[in-house]
Amino acid sequence: MKFRAICENHLYQKAYSKGKRQVTNAVAVYVLPDYAAKRLARSHPERRVTNRIGLTVSTKLGSAVVRSRIRRILREGLRSLEKELSLKQGFLIVIAARGAALSMKSTEIREELRVAFRKLGMIQEP
């Protein structure tokens, strides 16, 4: 499943400053309600509201090859987590990689994401 990306810098800044934050060893997750998506849902109820995702990996973590690898692992961890769990929709989600992500396996990063989303209250209970 392809994610809708956050493309505007001001949305990243808003998520960093006003969003809820959960930090683990490998990732920092910022979550903010996407008011534009909720406004769109009210005007077009037939459309499905989804989350918009932003991934950030600092240049401090390594070369472009290393940063791209971490980005791919984060994307795959989020994709498999969405298949397994039901995440709440209509949010801006920014995932920032941290230094410990370099030495972790993809399953470990996936578990870190699961812990962060659970603590943020993003997992829908059936």
What are the language-model segments listed below?
Residues M1-P126:
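Positively charged, solvent-exposed patches that mediate nucleic-acid binding
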